[in-house]
From Swiss-Prot:
Its main location: cytoplasm. Transmembrane segments: none annotated. GO terms for molecular function: chorismate lyase activity. The gene is ubiC. This is Chorismate pyruvate-lyase. Removes the pyruvyl group from chorismate, with concomitant aromatization of the ring, to provide 4-hydroxybenzoate (4HB) for the ubiquinone pathway. Substrate binds at residues 35, 77, 115, 156. It holds the Pfam family Chor_lyase. Its EC number is 4.1.3.40. It comes from Escherichia coli O139:H28 (strain E24377A / ETEC). GO terms for cellular component: cytosol. It is an enzyme of class 4 (lyase).
Length: 165
């Protein structure tokens, strides 16, 4: 099963450099902290609608593959992050199978828990980069994060109801 927001997320085109944008827009797009937490700061109840979760092969992650180690399988999680039931963000997380060891095995068991609630409680979290993307008037971003030095790629598309707009 897919969702139109995830199709648009995969269509994001990324800027080579951080574009000169309104400071409020950049504040959202370059946020280093948890987007879940930022949404909750808007006074909203945040929930996850699961679209897809499971192992995939390289041919299912062509956009992410150049940014991750080449492996036989990857854990893919596609969700809508909702605020008071309204979708504000589409998220796609790709995790190499080699990342799924030790405490990071929990990435497979998040269920309806927002990824940010797990990631931003880890003292081993680092971020390699944030890239800003755009498609058809919507903004997004992708980040390569590391847990205990092990990579994962998170792509987020801000949906029209999001306070980013």
């Amino acid at each position: 099963m897919s969702h139109p927001a995830l199709t648009q997320l995969r269509a994001l085109r990324y800027f080579k450099e951080i574009p000169a944008l309104d400071p409020q827009l950049l504040d959202w797009l370059l946020l280093e902290d948890s987007m879940t937490k930022r949404f909750e700061q808007q006074g909203k109840t945040v929930s996850v609608t699961m679209i897809r979760e499971g192992f995939v092969e390289q041919n299912e992650i062509p956009e992410e593959l150049p940014l991750l180690p080449k492996e036989s399988r990857y854990w893919l999680r596609e969700i809508l992050l909702c605020a008071d039931g309204e979708p504000w963000l589409a998220g796609r997380t790709v995790v190499p199978v080699s990342t799924l060891s030790g405490p990071e095995l929990a990435l497979q068991k998040l269920g309806k828990t927002p990824l940010g609630r797990y990631l931003f409680t880890s003292s081993t979290l680092t971020r390699d980069f944030i890239e800003i993307g755009r498609d058809a008037g919507l903004w997004g971003r992708r980040s390569r994060l590391r847990l205990s030095g092990k990579p994962l790629l998170l792509t987020e598309l801000f949906l029209p109801a999001s306070p980013l707009y």
